[in-house]
């Protein structure tokens, strides 16, 4: 009992330190409202979304999905949920075991990895099938059917006076525009806890028969990165109206072995008709009209009357609560020319991460907007998607996706067993079933392994209780068991090695890589945390783990600079080693400093990377990672410079999305990384005693913050 009292007291003191004593509380309404996105034209990169973490609906400038084809190569007009998945038939009966290939990385046993094969044949095709399947579904487009007097469809170029706002404080998109001189007013919102959309429309075009609602359904493409809509194969799927009355309609969708339901309820009389296969028209009878549409996986939804109004009310209640709890950062008193833009990015990133990355599963890199990597999620990215929720005092949003790991345990355990290791090995690319996607790169990644320990520790810090230890302790232990058995002991030099891996910097090869600096530091940190969890559970420390922690190799360096890995002696000569993620900076940026590194060497490395790195070949989270490294090294000006670096992959669009390139127009790990860095640059980290340690003290960065949590 005394032990727990001390733990709770320590946590209380920590929380007290999370809110600085300010002269006045931040005006959160003003902070949020001044960053509302405003759209005035059709632009495929300005699509806005509503959602709740498990469901998202993305719209064009009409407030619905009226012109999806025009947005397909920008930010697609997606309708996605966490449960909406599909698999193509498997007539050849491929087995995952057919993708296994044996490797020997000098650990005393053979290891089986699920990989891709270059040679054509059954193994190649099996790997392709398991990469593509299952894939995330686009559940259907809901748009306006706008017609001219001659019956032709109105084109987007003919729509005028567009004025669209995302009201962040209420989670509602408000859109107005004119068609042939007549105004159309639209409100769009998502229910905060169900896969339900609410829409209200007011326009004289309705009574003229010139405005209807269309519903269009597609077959999945199975594409690597696209809107997942194939409209060319109507015979491969079915759309049935299984029940209807004056204001309630239930549709059943069948795609091979998968089914789902779409329930529509209007607030007045309407009719539903079929224009063509998978293309339905909803015709209202009043110039003021509202409806809800709910997507369900097993049975039709039961929707009460007046649900559109109730959904708008629930949306407002949820989002006002969201913005008034947890952390906030106000840059209105900062005079640096970049401050306003940084504030905009932070506000919009909070909204996007809440609607796209706060669901029951780890999110895909493009969230619930459109498919990337077939809609599957990457566990090495879960840190970037979710850690900020803890630092911004919204720990419940982190916990939502942590339960999935328990369901993935049997498969993660089997991966470790077939590779000859203890514990469990978290896979890189997967789906709700936890099936490992074969990969020539991903199957050899290892930096996702400690993430579970890191995130469980954040949950414990927020709620230091026996219940948290009970809930997560087993998986913390199993995760650490793998890490301990994976490290190879070098008897000649009396140290442990990490080898046979592809590092976070994916330009390194598994067969050559030894002791990449970030992974070694992460092993050091996470194994130490795992020992603390044993002590909290009244279990003695594992002596073998202590030996591992003590004998991990110091980070390899040359000429005062840290190497990409111990074998990469030409790190600063070969562009292969100075492209992709500058992961060496994560050894201090994402993690606390440790005995394996020298701060002066890390400063040298930071300076070299800022000046010379191949920044054209980087990713959105590389900038916040660099900023966090600079902040921990007491280089706040460099931290800000890194966070606001003017590079393509550090671009934030009008809607807040982190643009990467023509393939990845949405990249949520960048948004999450920005929020992690911003919180850390304000609230600091364990042992830090400086307010806003990540911002210069030259008078240009007068930053006000509240209710943020220090990083470990």
Pin down the residues of each PLM region:
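Acidic/polar, glycine-enriched structural segments that form the non-catalytic walls/loops
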Residues: 19-376, 395, 405-411
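C-terminal motif of bacterial Sec signal peptides marking the signal peptidase cleavage site
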Residues: 15-17
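Acidic/histidine-rich catalytic neighborhood
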Residues: 478, 482-533
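Catalytic cores of secreted or luminal carbohydrate-active enzymes
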Residues: 124-158, 163, 669-710
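Active-site core of glycosidic bond-cleaving carbohydrate-active enzymes
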Residues: 65, 69-70, 378-411, 432-435, ...
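Acidic/His metal-coordination segments adjacent to aromatic residues that form catalytic metal sites
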Residues: 362-375, 426-442, 499-516, 649-664
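Primarily short, surface-exposed interaction patches in extracytoplasmic proteins
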Residues: 330-339, 343, 361-375, 385, ...
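Sec-dependent N-terminal signal peptides
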Residues: 4-13
């Amino acid at each position: 009992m005394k032990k727990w009292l001390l733990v709770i007291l320590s946590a209380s003191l920590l929380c007290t330190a999370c809110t600085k004593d300010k002269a006045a509380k931040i005006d959160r309404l003003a902070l949020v409202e001044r960053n509302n996105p405003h759209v005035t034209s059709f632009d495929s990169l300005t699509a806005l979304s509503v959602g709740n973490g498990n469901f998202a609906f993305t719209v064009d400038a009409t407030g619905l999905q009226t012109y999806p084809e025009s947005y397909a190569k920008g930010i697609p007009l997606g309708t996605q949920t966490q449960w909406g998945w599909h698999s193509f038939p498997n007539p050849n009966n491929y087995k995952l075991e057919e993708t296994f290939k044996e490797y020997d990385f000098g650990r005393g046993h053979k290891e089986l990895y699920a990989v891709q094969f270059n040679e054509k044949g059954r193994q190649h095709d099996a790997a392709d099938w398991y990469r593509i399947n299952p894939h995330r579904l686009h559940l259907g487009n809901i748009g306006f059917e706008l017609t001219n007097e001659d019956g032709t469809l109105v084109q987007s170029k003919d729509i005028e006076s567009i004025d669209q706002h995302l009201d962040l404080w209420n989670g509602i998109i408000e859109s107005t525009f004119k068609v042939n001189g007549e105004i159309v007013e639209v409100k769009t919102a998502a229910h905060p806890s169900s896969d339900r959309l609410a829409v209200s429309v007011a326009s004289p075009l309705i009574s003229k028969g010139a405005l209807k609602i269309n519903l269009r359904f597609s077959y999945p493409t199975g594409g690597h990165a696209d809107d997942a809509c194939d409209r060319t194969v109507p015979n491969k799927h079915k759309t049935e109206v299984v029940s209807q009355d004056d204001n309630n309609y239930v549709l059943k969708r069948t795609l091979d072995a998968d089914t789902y339901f779409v329930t529509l309820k209007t607030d007045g009389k309407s009719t539903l008709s079929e224009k063509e296969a998978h293309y339905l028209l909803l015709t209202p009878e009043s110039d003021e009209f509202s409806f809800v549409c709910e997507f369900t996986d097993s049975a039709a939804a039961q929707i009460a009357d007046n649900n559109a109004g109730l959904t708008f009310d629930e949306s407002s209640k949820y989002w006002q609560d969201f913005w008034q709890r947890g952390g906030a950062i106000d840059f209105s008193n900062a005079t640096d020319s970049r401050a306003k833009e940084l504030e905009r990015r932070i506000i919009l990133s909070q909204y996007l991460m809440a609607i796209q990355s706060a669901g029951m599963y780890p999110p895909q890199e493009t969230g619930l907007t459109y498919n990337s990597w077939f809609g599957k999620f990457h566990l090495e990215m879960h840190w970037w998607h979710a850690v900020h929720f803890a630092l911004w005092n919204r720990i419940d949003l982190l916990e939502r996706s942590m339960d999935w790991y328990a369901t993935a345990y049997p498969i993660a355990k089997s991966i470790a067993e077939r590779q000859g290791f203890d514990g469990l090995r978290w896979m890189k690319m997967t789906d709700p079933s936890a099936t490992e996607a074969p990969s020539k790169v991903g199957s050899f990644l290892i930096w996702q392994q400690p993430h579970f320990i890191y995130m469980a520790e954040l949950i414990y810090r927020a709620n230091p209780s026996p219940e948290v230890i009970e809930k997560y302790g087993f998986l913390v232990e199993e995760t650490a068991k793998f890490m301990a058995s994976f490290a190879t002991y070098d008897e000649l030099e009396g140290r442990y090695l990490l080898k046979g891996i592809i590092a976070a910097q994916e330009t390194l090869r598994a067969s050559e890589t030894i002791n990449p600096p970030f992974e070694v530091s992460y092993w050091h940190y996470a194994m130490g945390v795992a020992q603390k969890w044993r002590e909290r559970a009244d279990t003695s420390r594992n002596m073998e783990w202590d030996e591992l922690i003590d004998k991990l190799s110091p980070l390899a360096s040359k000429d005062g600079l840290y190497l990409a890995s111990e074998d990469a002696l030409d790190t600063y000569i070969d562009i292969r080693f100075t492209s992709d993620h500058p992961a060496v900076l994560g050894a201090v940026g994402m993690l606390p400093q440790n005995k394996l590194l020298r701060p002066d060497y890390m400063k040298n490395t930071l300076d070299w990377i800022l000046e010379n790195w191949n920044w054209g070949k980087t990713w959105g989270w590389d900038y916040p990672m660099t900023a966090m490294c600079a902040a921990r090294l007491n280089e706040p000006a460099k931290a800000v410079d890194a966070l606001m670096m003017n590079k393509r992959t550090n671009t934030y669009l009008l809607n807040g999305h982190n643009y990467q390139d023509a393939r990845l127009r949405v990249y949520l790990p960048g948004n999450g990384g920005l929020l992690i860095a911003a919180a850390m640059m304000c609230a600091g980290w364990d042992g830090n005693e400086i307010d806003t340690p990540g911002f210069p003290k030259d008078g240009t960065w007068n930053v006000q913050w509240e209710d943020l949590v220090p990083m470990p």
